[in-house]
Each structure stands twice: as C-alpha cells, then as structure tokens.
C-alpha cells in the first residue's frame, strides 16, 4: 500500500510538472532531454503491470531494475503518444494548417521549420519551439485559416502535448488571423487607378479647349483677310476717281460719296464670274516685264459693273502683301511654274515640227505636196498672179476658233518670237473647200493649167500650148493605168478671179498680157477631162493630206 501511494504521488507530480516545465530544446539527438520522461514511462509500465494482477512482490526494489530487453518489449506493446505539428508558413508563403501525427507508428513531428511531416523515429523529432515562421511574412499575402487546428492529448493519462493552447507564448490556436496589408494594398491600387483616369480626363479636356480657343481666332483672321486685301488694293491703286470703283471697293456704308447709292456688303467677296480674255495678258518669263518677284495685274476697262473685283489694277511688289496668309504668294508661284513648264513644252513641239517640216522636201520629178502656195513662192509653176483665199471665195469659215500656242501666250507683243515661223493664214485652206468648189471653177482651173506660159512681153504661142497640153495628157493617162488627175496644182478659177480683182474685167490674164490676142483663144481646142479630183489618191506617193500641219501641236483651227 505505501508503494501504491508513492506511485500515485509521483504520477501527480509528473502531470503537474509537464505544463510548467521549460520549453524543449532544439537538440534532436537520440539522448533524452532529461531523466524525468524516462522515469514517468517506467512508472506507467509498472502501473499497468500492477493493474494486471501481478503479485505484490513484484513491487520490490529489484523489480524496478529490469533488463533492457524487457523494457523494449513493453514499449512495443504500448505505442508512444501522438505529437501535434503546429501550423506554419512554408517557403512559398503558403500557410500549412496544424495536423496531428496519430497514424500507426508515425507519432512524431519531424522535418524542418518550413517543411514538416510525421515520422516514427523519436531521434528525428523536430523542436518546433525554435522555429519562427509562425507569423505572416512581409511578402506573403495568404491569410491563415480562421480557426486553429485542434490538438489531441497523448495517450491515456498524458498531459497537454506541445502545440496546444498555452504551449507557445501568444498561442495561435483559435486566433483569427488577418492578411497583412490586405486593406491598404487593395485601396492603394484603386487610388492609383483613379488618379491616372482623372489625369487622362483632364488632359483630354484641356486639349479640346485649347483647340477650340485656337480655331476661333484663325477663322476670324481668315474672314478679315479679303477685307484687308481690298483695302490694300484700294490704297495702292490711288484715289478712286470713278464712283463705281469707290462703291465696289467699299465694304462699309458711307464711303461711296454723297451722290452714290447706298453701298452694301456683297454676298461673296470674290468674283464668281470667269474673267474675260482681256484680263489674260501674259508676258514671256524671260522678258524683263515678267519677273518672279513682281505682281503685275493689267486689265482692260470692265464691260459691266459686275466685274469690279477683277478690274482692280496694281503694279506693286510682293512685299506689300507679306502680312497676308501665304496662300496668295503660293498661288502666284504655282502659276509661274505652270507657265514655265508650258513654255518648255511649246519649245519642244516647235523644234519637232521644224525638223519634220524640213524632212518633207519634194524629190525631183514629183508634184507639189501643198494645194496652194503664197504668191511669189515659185516651186516650178508661175503663180505670180494668184490671189489669196479671200479673193478666190475659198476663205475659211468666218471667225475661226483658234487655240493659241504657248509662244503666243507667253511671247512679248512688242517683238516677234524666235520660233515664229507658223504657216500664214492664207495657207490654212481646208480640203473641203477645194473638193466642194463648183464645176465651173474646176473647168476654168484646167483651162488655166493648159494655157501657155504667161509673159508680159510675148504673146501666147500655139506650139507651146500644144506641147503643154500633150504633156499634161500623158501625165493624166499614166503608163497602162486609169487616168489620174493632177495633184497640188492651183484650184479652179484662181487666175481669172485674181485678174478680175486687179483689172476689173473677167477676161483671162494671158489675153490682157499679150495685148488682146482673141484669135488664139478662139482657135484653142476644148480640153477633154482625163481624170477627176477623187482619183488623186491613186497617184503613187501623193495622197490627199488628212490634216494640215502647223508649227505647234497647241494651235488648232476649227
């Protein structure tokens, strides 16, 4: 009985000394931390043996000194108490909850502070009190679980194990942990996003307001530009002597004079009508009258009062308009560039036309290429008495529309251009006038062709007339082919009409030149027609001209 009391007292002391004892050290060696746990284990074994019905003699002093083999067998029969692994933060910042090592023989919490697991060897047991990763790291935001894990006590009769409430100072069991910096971090992100959005909105609004503010003065300035231009032109043109000019140049009431009608502001400050051809007075770019830095506006008197703005004349420098927008000067410079390019194009066309014209020289023994020639040009036929198209009644249509070449537009009116070798107006007789002439005119033309050569001193010779008629007949008949007419000879009635214009009588010129030899005309046999004008195209190498060539491609007669 005294032995039982002694054992009970020792067991109570051991259970009381458990919670109040010091923290276990970090020593994980196989040696027990002190003699008290071994003594308690020995006492538990003895208590179990006594409860099993052992004799009282086994409680002697020799019974406490058992062999090691018998101690190991008793320990194998009674498993050690389960150990609790406390919750911790691993190397990834994740919180691992508390777990209890109570499965099989895995009764001890082993491993490291950042990686814990259950094991069955006591010597591998981890001293959890020496670890410091129980609080949230600064860089981790994962909150711990709201409720701490519940740890069970050890075996029967065991005290509170490590990890239970009160085992660590400021125990974490049951404590609700909050994520460190969760509130401030989230609010900071929202604040930053709000500030950026507000700054963007303010910038866009400021840009829109600045653009509107800058656009309004520009529009006002553009509206005032025509008025300033009109004022400048009015002052440079001198005092307005004509009332209509004063009325047209004034944009405010009261400037036209007492006797003028009440002026009003025009609907359009610019002239919407096309200026007349009289305003297009251009000068050659190379001439001293046309300089790139001088604006010279010269206009004829206006045909109607509606062209007031186009009739303002001034001969001033560009520097007087320097305060105006650059669009005026740019427009004038572009016009100058266009005129220069047109002048170069005209020179090129004139050179090509001159070269082609020189290549069209007639070979010997052929008929002339042109239907008419100017008086005195020669060419194998005596045409001294020919008249112009106006005298022959074959003049072109009245008022022909002519597109003037670039040399005419840009050339100086006071001197002839170096490229002025275009065909005269008398040469520009269309083919239709030749083909549509009357049969009477054709007959007179053939009679004129077969007449003897004219001479102011010698009368006509019948022998010469017969030889000329025979030569023309042979030419028209041709070698073994259809009769072909002459090409390029003077048209019908040229000599008779010209002589009538000069002397006032319709008789042929060779009769008057010969001194009135009427017998020769009576004895001359009538001419038999050998061909028509429609057969001109059958003459080899001589075709009807499809168009009249001029000195420039830009000059066209309609």
Curated annotation (Swiss-Prot):
Residues 148-181 have a biased composition (Gly residues). Glycans are attached at residue 26. Residues 1-22 form the signal peptide. The modification Phosphothreonine is found at residue 532. It comes from Mus musculus. It is a single-pass type I membrane protein. Its main location: membrane. Keywords: Cell membrane, Glycoprotein, Membrane, Phosphoprotein, Postsynaptic cell membrane, Signal, Synapse, Transmembrane, Transmembrane helix. Residues 57-77, 466-477 have a biased composition (Low complexity). Residues 53-79, 142-181, 236-263, 443-506 are annotated as: Disordered. N-glycosylated. Mainly expressed in neurons. Highly expressed in brain structures including cortex, striatum, olfactory bulb, amygdala hippocampus CA1-3 and dentate gyrus (at protein level). The lineage of its organism: Eukaryota, Metazoa, Chordata, Craniata, Vertebrata. Transmembrane protein that regulates gamma-aminobutyric acid type A receptor (GABA(A)R) trafficking, channel deactivation kinetics and pharmacology, necessary for fast inhibitory transmission in the brain. Enhances the action of benzodiazepine, a primary GABA(A)Rs target drug, in the brain. May affect channel kinetics of AMPA-type glutamate receptors (AMPAR), the brain's main excitatory neurotransmitter, necessary for synaptic hippocampal plasticity, and memory recall. May regulate the induction and maintenance of long-term potentiation at Schaffer collaterals/CA3-CA1 excitatory synapses. The modification Phosphoserine is found at residue 438. GO terms for biological process: gamma-aminobutyric acid receptor clustering; gamma-aminobutyric acid signaling pathway; memory; positive regulation of long-term synaptic potentiation; regulation of AMPA glutamate receptor clustering; regulation of GABA-A receptor activity. This is Protein shisa-7. The gene is Shisa7. It is found in: Postsynaptic density membrane. One of its GO terms (molecular function) is GABA receptor binding. Residues 453-462 have a biased composition (Pro residues). It holds the Pfam family Shisa_N.
